[in-house]
Each structure stands twice: as structure tokens, then as C-alpha cells.
């Protein structure tokens, strides 16, 4: 439809010269809106983390910043590449609708790999936040330097995979892509950048794909083990920890638990669609439009949950909006209570 093509060109002006059918236009509009909202929310959260965090939130705000910066960069990668991802047998075919298509094959494919590795790092960051809370409750000391080192260690694995994908063999040959897709995509020759790679020849790409999908299982296991241990420790040390410390810990754990549910509506649907398309139960062309919008939901939900649960951030937003709330607390409580109950 011409009107959808016009809307897509307005929202994403760098795609004005790109061939797009109706489904492509809807995809570009959706991705642009989701990533723009996610980018602005994470930019706001990063401002709050840097300038509006109380001193006693310092170790934890490093983990918040780690997740927020990851989501910011993810939004940039997603909106500049806008990849449609198709899978057929041992091949992965990516059609690029974003402006990265004009920067060559290597930049285009690495932008897609970058999206996957940033998604993985955001999950790892949530896990590290839960580990932080467990160790801070159990051993009572967790410095800012320790938090930074832990974030660097957590990012090492995604970055290592990302870097190892830099020499992947890709093909932009129209004849080869046409043979692989076998009529799956109409007007394939009209797209400016279509890249195909044979996954079976690249272990690093297989590891990255499995880490983003199956890797959530061990991450969930670690998070919920830490969650169980935190509640167990708080029950066993009632005489050691003050009521405010116990309340803060429970509220933080509640916030992290909510954030851990986000992948269930962002990553898992994309993974399920990918598996079903491999088995032939789902049309691969339809699946190609779902993966990036699904992953982008976490880019929006994470900052919303954080701002809602961290009281200083929430109060600042309410003050900015000139709103009053009945859950305002005294200045003495401000110094001890960080997380707001739902």
C-alpha cells in the first residue's frame, strides 16, 4: 500500500530508496517505533542512573547502567539494520531494510550478529544483578570495583563470540540466494542487501544462536537459585539484617524477577518461530518479520520496570510530571529505602 510506504519513509527516511512491499513497510514502521521508544526510555534511565542515584545504590547502579547501555546500543543496531531473518535448512538468509545496507556486506552482517550478542549480554546482565544481590546479602560487602569487574567478565563471552564472527563467509550473489530461497521471497532481486551464510560451517554463529535461545535456561536456573538463596538467607539472619535491608532486598529481587519474565514474551516467541520454521510448520517469510520486533520488546520493558521499582527514579519522574503520590516517604526513610513495593 502506498500510504504505508510513505509512512515508513517518513519514520525511517534513510530507507526511502529501499524496495519494500507492504509487509516490509509494516515491519519498518514497527521496528522504528519500538526501537525509538526503547532508545528514549533507556536514555532517560541512564540519566537517572548517573545523576539521580543515591550513594547507597552505587554498586547496583553499575549493573543497571550495564543493562541500560546494552539496550541503548541494541536499539541503535536494530534501527540501523532492520534485518529480516530467514532460515532454510543449514542456511541463514538476512534481508536488510535499514541504512546499514549501504555500508557494505561486512557491516551489514556484523550488525545482525551485534543484535544477537547484545541480546545475550542483556540476559547475562540480569543474572549478574541477581548474583550481586545474593552476595551482598550473604557476605555484606560488594564494592563498585567488584561490580565493574563482574560486568566486564559477563560481557567477555558475548564479545568473544561477536569478534569470532567477523570472518564469517557470506554470499550476496543473487543467483545463489535465489537458489537457496527457491521462490520463498518475491522480487528478491529488488532488495539492495541480501546476505546468506551456511551456519554449519561456522561454529561461532551456531554457539551465538544457541546461546541466545537455549542459553536462557542456565541463566534462569542461576537467577532463581540466587532468588531462593536470598530469601533463605534473609529468613536465617533476621537478627543480623535490619528490617529496611530485608525489605530492600526483597523489593530488588521482585523487580529482577519481573525483568526475568520479559524474555518469555520477547526471546522465546522468536525462538519458537525459528524452530517451527525449521520444521516446516511456520512460513519462514512470516517468521522473518517477528524476530526483531519481539527482541525489541525487552528494550522497552526493562527501563519501565526499573523506573517503576527504584523509588528515587520513580519519584523524579513523578515530580517531573507534576504528579502527587500517596507513597511519598520521609527524608529519613529515603536514606534507607530504595525500592518501592508494587
Swiss-Prot record:
Subcellular localization is given as: Membrane
Which cellular component terms (GO) are annotated to the entry?
A: membrane
Q: Which InterPro entries match?
A: 7TM_GPCR_serpentine_rcpt_Srd, GPCR_Rhodpsn_7TM, Nematode_rcpt-like_delta
Q: What is this protein called?
A: Serpentine receptor class delta-33
Matching SUPFAM superfamilies, A to Z?
Family A G protein-coupled receptor-like
Task: Specify the superkingdom.
Answer: Eukaryota
* Keyword set, alphabetical order: Membrane, Transmembrane, Transmembrane helix
Q: Which family does it belong to?
A: Belongs to the nematode receptor-like protein srd family.
User: What PANTHER family does this protein's entry cite?
Assistant: SERPENTINE RECEPTOR CLASS DELTA-33 (PTHR22945:SF10), SERPENTINE RECEPTOR, CLASS D DELTA (PTHR22945)
Q: What is its main location?
A: membrane
Organism encoding this protein:
Caenorhabditis elegans
Kindly give the membrane topology term recorded for this protein: Multi-pass membrane protein
Amino acid at each position: 500500500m502506498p500510504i504505508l510506504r510513505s509512512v515508513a519513509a517518513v519514520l525511517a527516511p534513510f530507507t526511502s530508496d529501499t524496495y519494500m512491499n507492504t509487509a516490509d513497510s509494516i515491519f519498518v514502521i514497527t521496528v522504528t517505533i519500538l526501537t525509538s521508544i526503547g532508545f528514549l526510555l533507556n536514555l532517560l534511565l541512564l540519566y537517572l542512573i548517573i545523576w539521580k542515584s543515591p550513594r547507597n545504590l552505587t554498586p547496583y547502579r553499575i549493573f543497571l547502567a550495564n543493562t541500560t547501555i546494552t539496550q541503548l546500543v541494541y536499539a541503535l543496531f536494530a534501527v540501523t539494520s532492520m534485518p529480516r531473518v530467514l532460515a532454510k535448512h543449514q542456511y541463514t538468509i538476512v534481508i536488510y531494510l535499514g541504512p546499514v545496507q549501504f555500508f557494505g556486506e561486512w557491516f551489514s552482517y556484523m550488525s545482525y550478529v551485534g543484535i544477537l550478542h547484545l541480546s545475550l549480554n542483556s540476559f547475562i546482565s540480569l543474572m549478574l544483578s541477581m548474583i550481586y544481590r545474593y552476595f551482598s546479602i550473604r557476605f555484606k560487602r560488594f564494592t563498585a570495583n567488584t561490580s565493574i569487574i563482574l560486568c566486564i567478565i559477563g560481557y567477555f563471552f558475548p564479545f568473544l563470540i561477536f569478534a569470532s564472527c567477523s570472518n564469517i563467509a557470506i554470499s550476496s550473489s543473487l543467483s545463489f540466494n535465489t537458489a537457496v530461497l527457491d521462490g520463498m521471497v518475491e522480487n528478491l532481486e529488488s532488495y539492495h542487501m541480501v546476505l546468506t551464510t551456511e551456519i554449519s560451517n561456522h561454529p561461532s554463529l551456531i554457539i551465538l544462536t544457541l546461546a541466545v535461545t537455549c542459553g536462557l535456561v542456565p541463566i534462569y536456573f542461576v537467577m532463581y537459585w540466587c532468588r531462593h538463596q536470598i530469601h533463605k538467607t534473609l529468613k536465617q539472619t533476621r537478627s543480623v539484617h535490619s528490617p529496611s535491608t530485608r525489605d530492600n532486598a526483597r523489593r530488588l529481587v521482585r523487580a529482577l524477577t519481573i525483568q526475568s519474565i520479559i524474555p518469555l514474551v520477547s526471546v522465546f516467541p522468536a525462538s519458537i518461530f525459528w524452530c517451527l520454521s525449521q520444521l516446516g510448520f511456520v512460513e519462514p517469510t512470516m517468521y522473518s518479520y517477528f524476530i526483531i520486533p519481539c527482541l525489541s520488546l525487552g528494550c522497552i520493558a526493562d527501563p519501565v520496570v526499573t523506573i517503576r521499582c527504584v523509588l528515587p527514579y520513580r519519584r523524579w519522574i513523578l515530580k517531573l510530571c507534576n504528579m502527587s503520590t500517596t507513597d511519598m516517604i520521609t527524608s529519613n526513610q529515603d536514606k534507607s529505602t530504595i525500592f518501592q513495593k508494587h
